Curated annotation (Swiss-Prot):
UniProt cross-references to Pfam families, sorted A to Z: Bax1-I
Keyword Signal: no
Protein name: Protein LIFEGUARD 1
Lineage: Eukaryota, Viridiplantae, Streptophyta, Embryophyta, Tracheophyta
Any GO CC annotation of this UniProt entry: membrane
Segments passing through the bilayer: 33-53, 67-87, 95-115, 120-140, 149-169, 178-198, 212-232
Gene name in the database record: LFG1
Amino acid sequence: MAKSDIETGGGNELYPGMKESSELRWAFIRKLYSILSLQLLVTVGVSAVVYFVRPIPEFITETHRGLAVFFVILLLPLLLLWPLLAFEKKHPINCIVLSIFTLSISFSVGICCSLSQGRIVLEAAILTAVMVFGLTIYTFWAVKRGHDFSFLGPFLFGALLIILVFTLLQIFHPLGKLSSMIFSGIASIVFCGYIIFDTNQLIKKLNYDEYITAAIRLYLDVMNLFLSLLGIISN
């Protein structure tokens, strides 16, 4: 039985007019999704530990030291973005920094999960998995037929800025349940758009040595989509 393109490295073009080697592009895609899968497994593991070991969220949410630790962990991914980009092509430093980045995000996600019921977290996780899988398959299918989603970039970036501003405003002026649910719904649509956009970029635009950048982008897309869906279901 003949193997599929994904298994063999791809004999067919990923998109019309493809001039590069499809085998090299498929190798890049496999490497990227292997890294992303490891990141997601680490996130599930760390989040599960934080969720089920109740002294951890209690320390974070009920003590001043815990809040300070959580604030540092929230800032850590932002601080790590520079070394991630600076050492992107320097192995194994890039993998070490990426691991720390993933662990810090995972801990933050675990704290967010600990504030919700287990059933709600599970529903959000299942919805996220279904949407990510569906959007990824759709993007590969659409790109194969000549569609290009690069035009989404400016619109998604503008929407992301609005989301960041609203998130900061909620710190000082918390939204009601209905407003918070609407906000989470809009955010989930934006991050669905980002999954399509970033998948399009990894198929057509990114260089073969930019797998760290691609992994970070897709990982953040998935995590933000999960947190947005968690916000919808929680409300």
